[in-house]
């Protein structure tokens, strides 16, 4: 029908109103249809009485004894639960419809969780480039709740697995005498016998005091002990022992108590505030060795009994760390570390944040499990970029674990029952440096994954791959929170040992960075295109080694109270409050002395290569940081390493190893006469003598490296100059210190100017660099 021209044209408002009226009419019709359908449908009767039978008995129409759990569920190994009325399905609903709704709800929850993860992504300091792809973090992908069928299947599988474990892990109780565990009347009596059998525990009040010292003086970067839970263990162990119920005492808990006390005694010093005090450092050393041996005996007893407990895993990790600091990276250390990883897996700690984990642990205990797992995992990954027998390998695969990152909290904050409570990265806590250690470990794992045993340093692609890995270290160092920067002042309320913790953290970063770039030191600038291509890698390696040398020597000077010579005075750690930081345990930390040793080896090798070449790249900087300065720093570091050997067996052995490596490659020269007068200096004192004597009395056979005095070190006589002799005044011929190293340097190379591998030149160096 045509519109009459006499009428005005219909405007847009007319059509808009017509559309709105049509929509309203359709909506009203749909509303009437829905009301009619709901009225004609069957009405669902409400439940008159509360449900008394469990879900399993009700679904299978069997009699329920209404126990908790009931007999039917207990027989089948299933969880006994009663479905709430709000979640109960209607009687008229079909199974297909309920399954479809379940899948729809699961999909919606997954999409919502993924959206929240994308929008509110965590910006914690540990979130590096490899966190989102490795799948190890519990928050890497959303946790979707298990459906009823999935939960029943997992419970059945767990029941069958536990039945198998009970049959296959029978303890060997026959043929051995149970370990005798007693409580001494005084702390001195617990180690005065000098033998670990019977195992003597210190009095209860002393054990509680040392637990507080272990947690509050966290110089060891091991926040895997919670004061409240550990004190509860002590309160259970001591009354049982005093009542004579030794069969009711778990030896793993005894091992944890002894391991904590042994660590406190090993790092004890009278100048550090603590709740438990020894009379002398020699007494603390004796107690540490006896308690450590007793803890190992108790841990072996727990293994014979087939004990599985969180305390056993904690004890194994602490004993591994203590063994590393006492003996270095020995075979026992590697076995204890592997045992700690296995203990965590047996307890399911690697799945503490998985979908199927239905643990009833408290918030503090769950957080403790996260810290323990990340400690053993980080140690495992760092050993992969560490040298020694485990170099280039790791056993903890990130996709086989589901554990969230630890939160940035102090030990006292764990008492708050909250899973979301955490401090910002710029707030220093007892876990701040530990989180950065995890980040370092993840970088080490990615570096190991990017390399192959068949890689050749002559390949340019390998150099590019190494530089890409080095960029990970660089970004991690540059993005550290302000309190963890070396030159930053210590904030108010920071942990007591934050200064030492962050210095050890930077040692780990720069030492492994230097180790990554170390193979390219074999090329010189005069080696044509390859020498020019690898120049940046060599410069970064030397710079990182110098940083390690400066940090470690500054720490040892502060700990040993040795004044640095004026020409080599460094400012890298001279921040406000540096000298007020506790320093006593530093020279007993194997991390510091090991990294110092490897930095000295790298710089000595680089210095010798430059001396042997016709071009000296640092000739223009001879006045500040030139070769003469580097020679003096190396000699001073050598002196500090030997001085630390008075109380640290690892440091004393590393001095022997350094001279052994030099002698093996015919670098024996004037190094044995660093002192211009050629005089001898007995560097080993009474503390090392006490340690060796205690090891002998405890049943440990002392090897050649554990003898006392300069006689134990044939090449050490005269190697250490007089402490009263000033350096840099012409009396100490620093130029002769490393002249023997570049003697016969051409013998280090094979024909056709093809360098032998770095591992052949420094065959023994890698095994002495600790995690």
UniProtKB/Swiss-Prot annotation:
One of its GO terms (biological process) is DNA-templated transcription. It is found in: Nucleus. GO terms for molecular function: DNA binding; DNA-binding transcription factor activity, RNA polymerase II-specific; zinc ion binding. PANTHER family: CENTROMERE DNA-BINDING PROTEIN COMPLEX CBF3 SUBUNIT B, UNCHARACTERIZED TRANSCRIPTIONAL REGULATORY PROTEIN. This is Transcription factor TAS2. The keyword Cell inner membrane does not apply. Residues 33-53, 125-150 are annotated as: Disordered. Residues 42-51 have a biased composition (Low complexity). InterPro entries: Sec_Metabolite_Reg, Transcription_factor_dom_fun, Zn2-C6_fun-type_DNA-bd_sf, Zn2Cys6_DnaBD.
């Amino acid at each position: 029908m045509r519109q009459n021209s006499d009428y005005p044209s219909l405007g847009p408002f007319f059509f808009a109103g017509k559309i709105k009226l049509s929509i309203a009419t359709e909506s009203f019709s749909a509303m009437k249809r829905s009301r009619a359908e709901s009225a004609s449908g069957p009405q669902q009767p409400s439940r008159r009485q509360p449900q008394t039978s469990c879900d399993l008995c009700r679904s299978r129409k069997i009699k329920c004894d209404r126990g908790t759990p009931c007999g039917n569920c207990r027989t089948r190994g299933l969880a006994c639960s009663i479905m709430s009325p709000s979640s109960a399905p209607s009687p008229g609903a079909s199974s297909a419809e309920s399954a479809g709704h379940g899948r729809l709800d699961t999909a919606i929850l997954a999409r919502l969780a993924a959206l929240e993860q994308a929008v509110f992504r965590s910006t914690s300091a540990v979130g590096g480039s490899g966190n989102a792809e490795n799948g190890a973090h519990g928050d890497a992908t959303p946790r979707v709740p298990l459906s009823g069928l999935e939960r029943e299947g997992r419970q059945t599988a767990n029941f069958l697995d536990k039945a198998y474990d009970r049959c296959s892990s029978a303890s060997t109780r026959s043929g051995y005498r149970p370990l005798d565990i007693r409580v001494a009347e005084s702390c001195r009596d617990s180690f005065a016998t000098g033998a670990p059998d019977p195992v003597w525990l210190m009095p209860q009040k002393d054990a509680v005091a040392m637990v507080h010292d272990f947690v509050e003086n966290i110089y060891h970067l091991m926040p895997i002990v919670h004061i409240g839970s550990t004190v509860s263990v002590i309160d259970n162990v001591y009354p049982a022992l005093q009542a004579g119920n030794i069969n009711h005492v778990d030896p793993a808990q005894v091992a944890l108590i002894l391991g904590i006390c042994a660590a406190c005694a090993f790092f004890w010093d009278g100048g550090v505030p603590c709740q438990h005090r020894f009379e002398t450092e020699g007494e603390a050393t004796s107690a540490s060795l006896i308690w450590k041996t007793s803890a190992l005996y108790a841990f072996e007893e727990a293994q014979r009994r087939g004990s599985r407990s969180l305390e056993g895993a904690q004890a194994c990790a602490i004993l591994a760390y203590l063994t590393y600091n006492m003996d270095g990276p020995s075979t026992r250390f590697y076995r204890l570390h592997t045992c700690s990883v296995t203990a965590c897996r047996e307890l399911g700690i690697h799945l503490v944040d998985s979908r199927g984990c239905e643990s009833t642990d408290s918030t503090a205990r769950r957080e403790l499990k996260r810290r323990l797992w990340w400690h053993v995992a980080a140690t495992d990954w760092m050993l992969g970029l560490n040298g020694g027998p485990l170099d280039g390998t790791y056993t903890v695969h990130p996709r086989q674990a589901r554990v969230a990152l630890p939160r940035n909290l102090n030990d006292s904050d764990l008492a708050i029952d909250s899973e979301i409570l955490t401090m910002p990265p710029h707030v220093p806590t007892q876990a701040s440096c530990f989180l950065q250690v995890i980040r370092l470990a993840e970088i080490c794992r990615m570096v190991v994954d990017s390399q192959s045993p068949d890689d050749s340093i002559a390949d340019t692609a390998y150099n590019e791959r190494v530089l890409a890995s080095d960029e990970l270290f660089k970004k991690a160092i540059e993005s550290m929170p302000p309190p963890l920067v070396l030159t930053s002042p210590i904030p108010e309320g920071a942990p007591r040992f934050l200064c030492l913790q962050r210095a050890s953290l930077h040692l780990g970063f720069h030492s492994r960075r230097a180790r990554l770039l170390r193979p390219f030191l074999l090329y010189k600038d005069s080696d044509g295109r390859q020498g020019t291509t690898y120049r940046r890698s060599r410069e970064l390696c030397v710079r990182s080694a110098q940083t390690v040398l400066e940090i470690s020597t500054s720490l040892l000077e502060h700990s040993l109270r040795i004044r640095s010579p004026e020409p080599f005075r460094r400012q890298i750690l001279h921040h406000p409050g540096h000298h007020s930081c506790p320093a006593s345990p530093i020279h007993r930390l194997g991390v510091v002395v090991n990294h110092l040793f490897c930095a000295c080896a790298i710089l000595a090798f680089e210095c010798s290569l430059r001396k042997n070449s016709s071009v000296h790249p640092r000739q223009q900087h001879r006045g500040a940081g030139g070769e003469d300065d580097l020679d003096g720093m190396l000699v001073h570091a050598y002196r500090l390493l030997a001085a630390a050997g008075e109380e640290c067996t690892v440091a004393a052995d590393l001095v022997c190893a350094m001279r052994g490596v030099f002698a093996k490659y015919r670098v024996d020269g004037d190094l044995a006469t660093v002192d211009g007068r050629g005089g001898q200096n007995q560097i080993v004192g009474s503390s090392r003598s006490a340690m060796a004597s205690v090891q002998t009395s405890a049943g440990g056979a002392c090897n050649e490296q554990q003898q006392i005095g300069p006689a134990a070190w044939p090449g050490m006589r005269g190697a250490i100059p007089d402490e009263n002799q000033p350096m840099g005044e012409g009396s100490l011929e620093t130029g002769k210190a490393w002249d023997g190293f570049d003697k016969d340097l051409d013998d280090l190379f094979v024909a056709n100017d093809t360098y032998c591998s770095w591992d052949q030149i420094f065959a023994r160096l890698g095994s002495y660099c600790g995690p």
